Amino acid sequence: DSVGSTTAHKQQNINHLLDK
């Protein structure tokens, strides 16, 4: 699902920012 991929991408981006 495109929506699922987008959500996963956003979540990964947030995780990256949090890790920083």
UniProtKB/Swiss-Prot annotation:
Family per record: Belongs to the tyrosinase family. Hemocyanin subfamily.
Function: Hemocyanins are copper-containing oxygen carriers occurring freely dissolved in the hemolymph of many mollusks and arthropods.
Presence of keyword Metal-binding: no
Keyword DNA-binding recorded: no
The name this protein goes by in its record: Hemocyanin subunit Ib
Source organism (scientific name): Panulirus japonicus (Japanese spiny lobster)
Region of interest called Disordered, as start-end residue ranges on this chain: 1-20
Subunit structure: Composed of 3 major subunits (IB, II and III) and 1 minor subunit (IA) which form homohexamers and heterohexamers. May also form larger structures.
Listed GO MF terms: oxygen carrier activity
Protein keywords: Copper, Oxygen transport, Secreted, Transport
Domain of life according to the entry: Eukaryota
Subcellular locations according to the entry: Secreted, Extracellular space
Tissue: Hemolymph.
Gene Ontology terms: cellular component: extracellular region
